[in-house]
């Protein structure tokens, strides 16, 4: 009897996996469209399943949003690790990292993309791995001369989030994003004689702030040049 039931069980598992993936895709699009307080019934309807199916996969709204954030940070981690290993220079790795975020912007639900703040320890751990990888890329760029400005991981993450917001209807937006990226990277590689080798206390302190926080960096200090985009 167990052998006879096996094909049916495989089919049920396959259906469950398809439903879950449909829910994840629908939830991602709905959060981008309406924000994190979008109706769960709307998400279920968009996925083509009943609300009961949604609750079988995600018991609460927080579970669903937390899964979307964790999944997004894991993808960003894959991107930054690939950029770090494939980039010929620090600057090239940085370009690859942000270009990947732009290409995947409709798949990411993160705090700087309109998602809720992250609290789950396992998700924070993945986020911290991303930040450390970005720091390594920056240090590599300073060593090879392709990143000469006093950029911080916070700057890079914030700028990447700006360019990788969910798709806009303007057909020229992709080209605009890549022009802005090129301009930003050119600025990072430009030596400014006003900035000495010693980093200011304001910038050093800013490094330790959560990179997905919604707070603004402190005011510029006299003689300080920061590459933060706004």
Regions found by a protein language model. Name each.
Residues 111-121, 201:
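Short linear capping/connector segments at secondary-structure termini
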Residues 1-7, 96, 131-132, 136-147, ...:
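C-terminal peripheral helix-coil segments that are non-catalytic and often amphipathic
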Residues 1-37, 41-46, 63-66:
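Basic, helix-initiating cap at the start of DNA-binding domains
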Residues 67, 74, 78-107, 118-122:
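Hydrophobic alpha-helical connector segments
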Residues 35-36, 56, 148:
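Helix-turn-helix/winged-helix DNA-binding modules
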Residues 48-58:
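Short hydrophobic/aromatic patch on the recognition helix
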Residues 22, 42, 92-100, 155-159, ...:
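Amphipathic alpha-helical interaction segments
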Residues 100-108, 163-166, 187-191:
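Phosphate/oxyanion-binding loops and surfaces in catalytic or ligand/nucleic-acid-binding neighborhoods
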């Amino acid at each position: 009897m167990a052998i006879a039931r096996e094909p049916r069980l495989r089919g049920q598992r396959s259906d469950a996996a398809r439903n879950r993936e449909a829910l994840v895709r629908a939830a991602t699009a709905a959060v981008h469209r309406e924000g994190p307080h979008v109706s769960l019934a709307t998400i279920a309807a968009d996925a083509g399943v009943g609300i009961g199916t949604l609750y079988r996969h995600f018991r609460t709204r927080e579970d669903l949003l937390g899964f979307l954030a964790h999944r997004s940070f894991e993808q960003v981690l894959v991107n930054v690790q690939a950029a770090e290993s494939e980039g010929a220079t620090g600057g090239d790795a940085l370009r690859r990292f942000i270009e990947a975020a732009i290409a995947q912007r409709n798949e990411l639900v993160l705090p700087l993309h309109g998602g809720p703040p992250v609290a789950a320890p396992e998700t924070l751990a993945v986020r911290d791995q991303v930040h450390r990888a970005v720091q390594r890329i920056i240090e590599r760029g300073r060593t090879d001369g392709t990143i000469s400005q006093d950029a911080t991981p916070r700057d890079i993450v914030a700028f990447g989030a700006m360019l990788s917001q969910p798709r806009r209807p303007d057909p020229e937006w992709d080209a605009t994003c890549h022009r802005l990226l090129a301009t930003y990277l050119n600025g990072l590689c430009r030596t400014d004689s006003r900035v000495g080798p010693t980093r200011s206390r304001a910038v050093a302190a800013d490094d330790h702030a959560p990179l997905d926080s919604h707070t603004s960096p402190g005011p510029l200090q006299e003689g300080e040049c920061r590459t933060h985009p706004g």
